[in-house]
Amino acid sequence: MTTMKALVIAEPRNMVWTTRATPQPAPGEVLIKIVSAGICGTDIHAWAGNQPFFSYPRVLGHELCADIVETGSAVEGFAVGQRVALIPYLSCYQCDACQSGKTNCCEHISVIGVHQDGGFCDYLSVPASNLLAVDALAPEAAALIEPFAISAHAVRRAAVAQGDAVLVVGAGPIGLGAAAIAASNGARVIVADTSEYRRQHVSQQLGLPALNPADADFIATLRAEFNGQLALTLIDATGNPAAMNAAVNLIRHGGTVVYVGLHKGDLVIPDSEFHKKESTLMGSRNATREDFDRVREFMAAGKLRADMMLNRRFAFSTLAEHFEEAVINNRELIKGVIDFDR
């Protein structure tokens, strides 16, 4: 295994195969063989050239499940053959954010698969401190711990509790994860999405009500679902500026809006509504180890399942040839996982 295959985004809309030297782990690192990898919205935006924190060329892939094949000389607590998932955020642990426990928004953060090469390749060497043991989980579930952790962080930021009225806008992977986790917290959850296909997915896989925000009676239906009130908490997972600008109109007085979806541009929020309601507005970025640990526990307990978001699987060996058609142009894709043994 002196060389390996890697899938590289050479430039926007140009994904190519390359052969690279297999990395060697530094003393505190572990060499992992990729088993499964999730395809993230970040990867899709990077392919299209509209990911704001990106440079080319780049090996994508930050949602990873892998097997350990070699450990560095200083690594303790992990062994060859162990199955692991990756926490892809490399934080400095020195800045004010890190020192206050917010390693997820480190001032100098580097994300594997975004700011440096990731796991759309056979092997990857990563810090042992960024691994989670996942021997009890199926590989496709373990690969999806990362997007579920982003959802979990947004729910934790909002302090969602038993009985809260929560509206999740956007039934993509992060929105689906947020809805599932908020419901596990005991909240009354409604999901809004303009896609009928995604609303059906919400109903079938999460067992939650799903509304079309474009319907003329959307707000009236929302109030009916929430006993005459608007949402106490709104989690926006769309990254759509129109939806994000309108979010404050869908919360009750004293309500909270959490932006977990990212928009590359400015937003215009109706200040009169924002102030009148004494609204709380917050962003949610990435996740911390606490969120990863919680998702792993929820998966082990059956509270979270891969099929809550996963609806397509791809073979790594043919991904470059089919990426545009099967991923970029697939209107029914919610979440895809790459299988490396196919």
Task: Report each predicted region and the residues it spans.
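C-terminal hydrophobic helical "lid"/dimerization subdomain
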Residues: M1-M4, N245, R289-R342
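Glycine-rich beta-strand-centered segment in the early N-terminal region that forms part
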Residues: A21-A37, N50-D96, D135-L137
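N-terminal Rossmann-like NAD(P) cofactor-binding module of classical short-chain dehydrogenase/reductase
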Residues: A85, L232-I235
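NAD(P)H dinucleotide-binding glycine-rich loop of Rossmann-like/cofactor-binding domains
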Residues: L90-V169, D307
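Mid-domain Rossmann-like dinucleotide-binding core that forms the NAD(H)/NADP(H) cofactor-binding site
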Residues: L137-D215
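Short amphipathic alpha-helix with an adjacent loop that forms part of the alpha/beta core around
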Residues: D217-G228
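Glycine-rich phosphate-binding loop and adjacent beta-alpha segment
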Residues: P241-K303, V337-R342
